[in-house]
Amino acid sequence: MTWLLFRTSGALAILMVLILVHGELRIETKGQHGEDETAIQGRRRYKREWVKFAKPCREREDNSRRNPIAKITSDFQATQKITYRISGMGIDQPPFGIFVVDKNTGEINITAIVDREETPSFQITCHALNVLGQDVEKPLILTVKILDVNDNAPVFSQSIFMGEIEENSASNSLVMILNATDADEPNHLNSKIAFKIVSQEPAGTPMFLLSRHTGEVRTLTNSLDREQVSSYRLVVSGADKDGEGLSTQCECSIKVKDVNDNFPMFKESQYSAHIKENTLTSELLRFQVIDWDEEFTDNWLAVYFFTSGNEGNWFEIQTDPRTNEGILKVVKALDYEQLQSVQFSIAVKNKAEFHQSVISQYQVKSTPVTIQVVNVKEGIAFHPASKTFTVRKGISSKKLVNYVLGTYQAIDEDTNKAASYVKYVMGRNDGGLLFIDPKTAQIKFVRNIDRDSTFIVNKTITAEVLAIDENTGKTATGTIYVEVPGFNENCPTVVLEKKAICSSLRSVVVSARVPDNKYTGPYTFSLEEQSLKLPVVWSITTLNATSALLNAQQQLSPGEYTISLTVTDSQDRQCETPESLTLEVCQCDNRDICRSSNGNKDYERLDGKRPSGRLGSAAIGLLLLGLLLLLLAPLLLLTCDYGVGPIGGVTGGFIPVPDGSEGTIHQWGIEGAQPEDKEITNICVPPITTSGADFMENSEVCTNTYAGGTVVEGASGMELTTKLGAATGSGAAAGFGATAGFGAATGLGIGSAGQSGTMRTRHSTGGTNKDYGEGAISMNFLDSYFSQKAFACAEEDDVQEANDCLLIYDNEGMGAPSSPVGSLGCCSFIADELDDSFLDSLGPKFKKLAEISLGIDDEAKQSQPLSKASLSGMESCGYSLEVQQPESVRGQTLLGSQGASALSASSSVLQSATSIPNPVQHGSYMVTETYSASGSLVQPTTTVLEPLLTQNVTVTERVICPISNVSGNLQTPMELRGSRNMICTEDPCSRLI
């Protein structure tokens, strides 16, 4: 049964092949009248090949009368239902809806007018589909061609074509090519364009020829002349269908280019002018020419030249580019005595070469020019304008001073003789080497020439000489050239074979070395003349061509010797200066090594070499260690606190340097907190013995009288001096002195609270001894300052009342018109707004200070009454103070927590108030004042200060400040107990600081 299955399958396969072979898709086309089939024979089998074209259609026409333009047919149509479908341009691609197909019959129809310029042809894809929509045939590509019609005119690429041609060009020379296009079908009669010239401007003889089909514009003749017609305008037409169809016009602008075909000609046949002799001018004459070529071109621009007569090069001709004129210049002065008139000829040509068409016709035509020279009175001049001098060979460059070169005189051009009344000076004189005699014009050297002088160029020195006419002031300039020989040129250098020799040797070899090999020996060595005073006489013997042996006639002792040698070559040339050689002679050891003169172990070999040394490893290590320390130092600086650590201790930061200001203003170091009020210990006053002697404790007080004055000196160097009833003294703990003379008594003492000492009084008749200690302030400055201030205050007190201090008024309100503060009443309207009740009193801290300043301390009045004959101080430390007064004395003692004392005496001479001097130094202040009513010499009181454990305050010169701790005594000397003396402070009008 198996073979039956294979037989059935084979029969079915053969049947399918037969169906496929006999089935086909055919295209039928009808003629114009639909009667016969064209393009493809009907019902012919093409073996599955499709026809690729259909009936053509004409553009811009209604082609519907030709429908159907094609018909497609499939062979499967006989056995099954076939549906036809088309696609492509004109169907489902732009332009849409041009073609349609009958899906049952396969007829293709055109439904719209087409444009060939937009779509030259259409490609239509044809499909044959079964009922399932599947292709039963391979798709067929159908081409529909569109026939062209002449519907487009030619188009030129430019509306105006520009061209140019040189004048005198040969005929048939190409000028330009015109270009036009047609949108109709290429290579068709509809797109074939023909050109022709419609018109020419300027009208006349046709000058150009236009090719009909190529559009080339050529010259018709060779007679184009730019000077006659510089440009042409052509109107050109282009028509399709070889000139029978549509046409278009354009313009052609043709410029005729200029060529140098015209010769320039002088406007005048001859020219003449005149000029004064010895003068120059930039425009003596202008020449005009005529040239017909195009202006401001090289064909028009003239070039002037001399044909004869300007052999002396007196004249030049320059062309003016704006006018094309020739400008005659005089560049070299004319001499009337030599030339009374100058005649020359000129010619002209163009800058550009002449055109080949006329170059054979050009001939040089000369135009004569005559220049008359006018005679004028001439001055001086150098003839010749330059002169050369030569320095003779063999002279040294170091011996040129006063070397005479020669003379160079100016001449009078009217007489051609040496000019008179002329002064000569040097003009250009580089380096100031030369000098000319003002009268004789003799030139000589005034300086020697350095070996490397930059003023010598090519062995020549150039300078200028000026001759000044003393009558007219005119100047003539001449140039001189000084030729100098080659100084030191290739001069040999003499060297010693050894720089040092032993004292046992008496000879050394010298050699000559030449920088240039071509100057070789033999050389002759000779010694300069030697003085008889020299310790050693030398001689020299020639060894060979370049060496000699230098011998000493006597025994050499250690030291340096200088020998002068002269070297002469084979041509008798020698150096300008002798060569100076330095030879060292020294003591040598058994190894012939020269020992140095300093006695150390430094040796120098006789060959000039020193023992070599090297840097050891230890030295290298030290260098590296030093570098590391330098690098470590900045790092250590970064660890410093710069004073920001806590107060005290190791890291307490920087400690401020004491400046002495702590005694005046206490530095609390805080803001806002009130200072602590402390009591000040009273000043201790030593008692007085019954015998009148001073009781002292290690005070070292001694007295000496001189001229009624007193010197008060501290242990540290403080010194106060008073004399003739008026004194001012000041001193600092560091040590200084001040002295003042006649006038009111004022005193100032300054001392640091941190120092102590004993003040002693010395009285002498010869002078005052001043002991100064170490101090940070200039003693001379302080001495001068306080002395001047004391004199000024004293003189001021003598001539005016003391009204320039702080005055106290009973009433300072509005009712007191003389009150200096009466105007303060204007501020009474703010009394309600500001609480100024705190101004009614000074408070507990300043109350004592005010009592001390005003002298109203009640406690002092009650503690110690004042008697007529003596004044006793307070007794706080077991001491007392007594002062003998022969007359009535009114005094007060002020005691308080501040421990201050003040004494005053009544006198008609004293003023009520004292001017306020400015304090200049912080510290303790003390005033000692002495006055005598009888006029006799009265010695002042003595004040001795010794340190205590507490601070004390003395009010002086209106300044309250702490002074040094006091533990001494205050005592009036015995010599002053019979006089009127007082110890006082300034007026209560003092200011507080």
Swiss-Prot record:
InterPro entries: Cadherin-domain_protein, Cadherin-like_dom, Cadherin-like_sf, Cadherin_CS, Cadherin_Y-type_LIR, Catenin-bd_sf, Desmosomal_cadherin. Residues 641-713 are annotated as: Required for interaction with CTNND1 and localization at cell-cell junctions. Homodimer. Part of a complex that contains DSG3, PKP1, YAP1 and YWHAG; the complex is required for localization of DSG3 and YAP1 to the cell membrane in keratinocytes. Interacts with PKP2. Interacts with CTNND1; the interaction facilitates DSG3 localization and retention at cell-cell junctions. Interacts with CDH1; the interaction is required for CDH1 localization to developing adherens junctions. Interacts with RAC1; the interaction is required for DSG3 translocation to cell-cell junctions, organization of cortical F-actin bundles and actin anchoring at cell-cell junctions. Keywords: Calcium, Cell adhesion, Cell junction, Cell membrane, Cleavage on pair of basic residues, Cytoplasm, Glycoprotein, Membrane, Metal-binding, Repeat, Signal, Tight junction, Transmembrane, Transmembrane helix. Residues 1-23 form the signal peptide. Glycans are attached at residues 109, 179, 458, 544. Residues 24-48 form a propeptide. Three calcium ions are usually bound at the interface of each cadherin domain and rigidify the connections, imparting a strong curvature to the full-length ectodomain. One of its GO terms (biological process) is negative regulation of p38MAPK cascade. Desmoglein repeat repeats lie at residues 903-929, 930-960. GO terms for molecular function: calcium ion binding; protein dimerization activity. Coiled coil: none annotated. GO terms for cellular component: adherens junction; bicellular tight junction; cytoplasm; desmosome; plasma membrane; tight junction. It is found in: Cell membrane; Cell junction, Desmosome; Cytoplasm; Cell junction, Tight junction. Residues 49-617 are extracellular. Residues 48-156, 157-266, 267-386, 383-494 form the Cadherin domain. It comes from the Eukaryota. This is Desmoglein-3. The chain crosses the membrane at residues 618-638. It is a single-pass type I membrane protein. It comes from Canis lupus familiaris. A component of desmosome cell-cell junctions which are required for positive regulation of cellular adhesion. Required for adherens and desmosome junction assembly in response to mechanical force in keratinocytes. Required for desmosome-mediated cell-cell adhesion of cells surrounding the telogen hair club and the basal layer of the outer root sheath epithelium, consequently is essential for the anchoring of telogen hairs in the hair follicle. Residues 639-993 are cytoplasmic. Pfam families: CADH_Y-type_LIR, Cadherin.
